[in-house]
A protein has these predicted regions:
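Short beta-edge strand/loop motif at the mouth of beta-sheet-based domains
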Residues: 46-56
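Short beta-strand segments in beta-sandwich/barrel cores
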Residues: 37-39, 89-90
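Short, low-complexity N-terminal intrinsically disordered segments enriched in polar/charged residues
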Residues: 1-35
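Secondary-structure boundary/capping signal
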Residues: 25, 37, 66-69
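Structured beta->alpha junctions
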Residues: 18, 43, 74-76
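A beta-strand edge to alpha-helix "cap/lid" segment located at domain peripheries
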Residues: 2-5, 9, 55-129
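A short gly/proline-enriched turn/hairpin at secondary-structure junctions
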Residues: 38-48, 61-63, 122
Length: 129
């Protein structure tokens, strides 16, 4: 089956990404990525290679559950690639007191099954005014 990369597919993938982050569920994380995926935590980082390594890297230093939220959406889709934009918000341990906010851009490449084959992230902290 060949999956066509659409706005809907990318939106569902991004929602799954946020849910996997909120739960740190190994299967939910792994379900996002192809077996041979590359995951770049930043533009100048070496990639984490492969689904198993990506799952393990997510679990190495998890954010405290309940202290963050995020929303991302597609900006541009061309072929099997998508550019997305969104915002991640972090809170103190009480889960309510604002701590920091980050703007995020992801460049994603999908395989024929609609799994992410390449993930690249850019992030900038928003000023606290």
């Amino acid at each position: 089956m060949t999956e066509v990369v659409t706005n809907a597919l990318v939106s569902v993938w991004l929602d799954g990404y946020v849910q996997a982050w909120k739960t740190y569920d190994k299967e939910a994380i792994g379900a996002l990525f192809s077996e041979d995926a590359l995951y770049y935590y930043g533009p100048f980082h070496e990639p984490v290679r492969g689904r198993a390594a990506i799952v393990a890297s997510w679990l190495e230093q998890p954010d405290q559950v309940g202290t963050y939220d995020a929303h991302y959406e597609p900006v541009l889709i061309e072929g099997n690639r998508a550019v997305t934009n969104g915002r991640s918000r972090y809170f103190e341990q009480d889960g309510k007191t604002f701590k920091a906010e980050w703007d995020n851009v992801f460049i994603l490449r999908f395989d024929e099954q609609g799994l992410c084959k390449e993930y690249r992230e850019w992030y900038m902290e928003r000023p606290k005014n």
